[in-house]
Amino acid sequence: MKNWIFLAVSIFGEVIATSALKSSHGFTRLVPSVVVVAGYGLAFYFLSLALKSIPVGIAYAVWAGLGIVLVAAIAWIFHGQKLDFWAFIGMGLIVSGVAVLNLLSKVSAH
């Protein structure tokens, strides 16, 4: 269970860092740039801890999939990014795929 918490912290760090990239204006603004570097540092550190017991394929699928959906949602809410019907369908498929990997696949670490 602890390793799944590490993975959640890793996803949080990656989402914060990726979301701050837009505000950093190509690393020309100090505070958002520091958030980007710190967020990715946090993300990869905790991902490495999670990989001690979660298979890399599962961990990366969860990390990348949920990261994509959360970053898109944040961009939609805070930056006014337009998402159409098919974007929501695609995000739903990503979440469904992550759920299938974790709930039904025999390669998942439970």
Swiss-Prot record:
**Alphabetized GO MF terms:** transmembrane transporter activity
Q: Does the keyword Transport apply?
A: yes
Which keywords does this chain's UniProt record carry? Answer: Cell membrane, Membrane, Plasmid, Transmembrane, Transmembrane helix, Transport, Transposable element
Q: Where found?
A: Cell membrane
According to the UniProt record, one GO cellular component term is: plasma membrane
Keyword Glycoprotein listed? The answer is no
One Pfam family here: Multi_Drug_Res
Which InterPro entries does the record associate with it?
Small_drug/metabolite_transptr, Small_multidrug_res
Q: Which domain of life is it from?
A: Bacteria
Instruction: List where the protein spans the membrane.
Output: 1-21, 31-51, 58-78, 85-105
Per UniProt, what is the membrane topology?
Multi-pass membrane protein
Explain the purpose of this protein. Multidrug exporter. Is implicated for the resistance to bacteriocidal quaternary ammonium compounds.
PANTHER family linked to this entry:
MULTIDRUG TRANSPORTER EMRE, SMR FAMILY PROTON-DEPENDENT DRUG EFFLUX TRANSPORTER SUGE
Q: Which family does it belong to?
A: Belongs to the drug/metabolite transporter (DMT) superfamily. Small multidrug resistance (SMR) (TC 2.A.7.1) family.
**Protein name (database record):** Quaternary ammonium compound-resistance protein QacF
> Which organism is the protein's source?
Klebsiella aerogenes
